[in-house]
Design a protein with these regions (language model features):
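Metal-dependent de-N-acetylase/amidase catalytic core
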Residues: 1-133
């Protein structure tokens, strides 16, 4: 069933400026690299319609969710799993802004940011995810 025109659809995005800024505050773990601009520009978006700051509890929940998918995501915080038996640690130079890092199987480091970014895909604009509902 197709969504009605009034249905608001939000896409979770990687906001380009935030991603670049986050990468500037960390060093990749040994054996990992930072992604190239060309790579990042293929999937990041310029600007977000809504930014949601993550509380410490939400950030911890996000880390736990990432760790639960160890065959897909490797959190670079020194933890090990059967899938990723070698510890990977990213150097975090501004942990108050970028409290962690992770990578996929390509071992390209990505910043764990203190916000989630969304772009409106359909529906009336709003200044928050649930605005007007």
């Amino acid at each position: 069933k197709a969504a009605s025109p009034s249905t608001r659809i939000w896409y979770g995005i990687f906001e380009r400026a935030a991603t670049y800024a986050g990468l500037d505050t960390l060093d990749a773990p040994a054996g990992w690299t930072k992604p190239s601009q060309e790579y990042l520009d293929n999937f990041t978006n310029e600007g977000a319609d809504v930014t949601v700051a993550l509380s410490d509890a939400a950030l911890d929940a996000k880390r736990c969710a990432m760790r639960a998918h160890a065959s897909q995501i490797w959190v670079a915080d020194g933890t090990t799993t059967r899938t990723n038996p070698e510890a990977a640690v990213a150097a975090l130079h501004e942990p108050e802004h970028v409290p962690g890092a992770y990578g996929l199987s390509n071992l390209l480091v990505m910043p764990l940011l203190r916000a989630e970014y969304f772009q409106l895909g359909q529906g009336e604009p709003a200044d928050d995810l649930l605005g007007g509902l």
